[in-house]
Amino acid sequence: MTTTDPVANLAALIRCPSVTPAEGGALSLLDTLLSPLGFAVERVMATEDGTPDVENLYARLGTEGPHLMFAGHTDVVPVGDEAAWSHPPFSADIAGGEMYGRGAVDMKGGIACFVAAIARHIGKHGKPQGSVSFLITGDEEGPSINGTSKLLEWAAAKGETWDACVVGEPTNPDQLGDMIKIGRRGSLSGRITVQGVQGHAAYPHLADNPIRGLLQLTHALMHPAFDHGTDDFQPSNLEVTTVDTGNAATNVIPARATAAFNIRFNDSWTAESLRAEIIRRLDAAANEGELRPDRAPVKYEIVWADRPSHVFLTRNNALISSLSGAIETVTGKEPKLSTTGGTSDARFIKDYCPVVEFGLVGQTMHMVDERVAVADLETLTRIYETFIERWFAHADGK
């Protein structure tokens, strides 16, 4: 295999059926690509009770600073109905100028391109004046417990430090060069349970319908808006994601009702201040009687999900200007600096070094017939290669 060819790199990666949390041969393949370039490659198995064991990879070229990290994941989401695919999901077939396969854009394509980019850099200039590392997990599409966070802890414990990181997630909405992600909103989830009294639907006075109380509470969580956005972030937004009574009968008032919610929040809040605001709203709504006239206040219980994701924003000029300049040089486009979208493993990396995200076009990620334009693989490789040159020149003060 020619390591400098992103198309060949990606085809080989797609053919590894690494549906989370399976390694599927993808990390072994990366080992064979990176070791000949001089990278010291280590495989790290992470474990935690109640979760699948996950294998991860850390590879470093060089021993001195400045130190640039590329981060990503080789695990992919399930393919769904394989019969619905026009090309087998692990075939890496090319048709109409596009390569088909699960993980093509999310995010084996980004990994394939950065491998090609550093291989080209070494071929032209030799090893960088500093260090480059790959931090690759097999647990990004899963619970994200035995992946990037534990790999970072492991690496930091052995003395690894980094000056900047690029995560190769598919950040572009429409065309390559559209967008760099320089931050992410936080994410907080919880589950509310309201206890009632079960009874016959024809005799509501003999029961206490918990759905009425739950509606009061969830309405208070969605109205009014938590904020109207900030200079760098969209407005915080709460969505009720499940409602359940455990009751299939239409003539029975249920004994309890439960609702789960998720809020994506901006830098107006922390997870702690947001929890306090949610409790304040729930307590106020519990005492209202619009949906429960002549009833006692709603009794509710709230359970918070573990590990909220905290909001972050990167303002590192060397990192952002080097990447933005590389994109403009290669594509002629000035990328938008954005904080939109969901969470990513950048939320873990931001505690160790400045981090941004840039990869392929994400229109088909997680979909049937996930695919990438072959031409985009070459373009992204050129962007990454130019970025590597610019970042090390900037970091060295040249």
UniProtKB/Swiss-Prot annotation:
Cofactor note: Binds 2 Zn(2+) or Co(2+) ions per subunit.
Gene Ontology biological-process annotations: diaminopimelate biosynthetic process; L-arginine biosynthetic process; lysine biosynthetic process via diaminopimelate
Keywords noted in UniProt: Amino-acid biosynthesis, Cobalt, Diaminopimelate biosynthesis, Hydrolase, Lysine biosynthesis, Metal-binding, Zinc
Molecular function terms, GO-annotated: acetylornithine deacetylase activity; cobalt ion binding; succinyl-diaminopimelate desuccinylase activity; zinc ion binding
Residue numbers annotated as active site: 75, 140
Top-level division of the source organism's lineage: Bacteria
Recorded metabolic or biological pathway in which this protein acts: Amino-acid biosynthesis; L-lysine biosynthesis via DAP pathway; LL-2,6-diaminopimelate from (S)-tetrahydrodipicolinate (succinylase route): step 3/3
Binding of Zn(2+) 1, residues: 73, 106, 169
Gene3D superfamilies from the UniProt entry: Zn peptidases
Binding site residues for Zn(2+) 2: 106, 141, 366
EC number from the UniProt entry: 3.5.1.18
Keyword set includes Metal-binding: yes
Catalytic activity as recorded in UniProt: N-succinyl-(2S,6S)-2,6-diaminopimelate + H2O = (2S,6S)-2,6-diaminopimelate + succinate
Cofactor(s) essential for the protein: Zn(2+); Co(2+)
Cross-referenced InterPro entries: ArgE/DapE_CS (IPR001261), Bact_exopeptidase_dim_dom (IPR036264), DapE_proteobac (IPR005941), Peptidase_M20 (IPR002933), Peptidase_M20_dimer (IPR011650), Peptidase_M20A (IPR050072)
PANTHER family: ACETYLORNITHINE DEACETYLASE (PTHR43808), N-ACETYL-L-CITRULLINE DEACETYLASE (PTHR43808:SF31)
Assembly description: Homodimer.
Functional summary from the UniProt entry: Catalyzes the hydrolysis of N-succinyl-L,L-diaminopimelic acid (SDAP), forming succinate and LL-2,6-diaminopimelate (DAP), an intermediate involved in the bacterial biosynthesis of lysine and meso-diaminopimelic acid, an essential component of bacterial cell walls.
Family affiliation: Belongs to the peptidase M20A family. DapE subfamily.
Descriptive protein name: Succinyl-diaminopimelate desuccinylase
Organism encoding this protein: Agrobacterium fabrum (strain C58 / ATCC 33970)
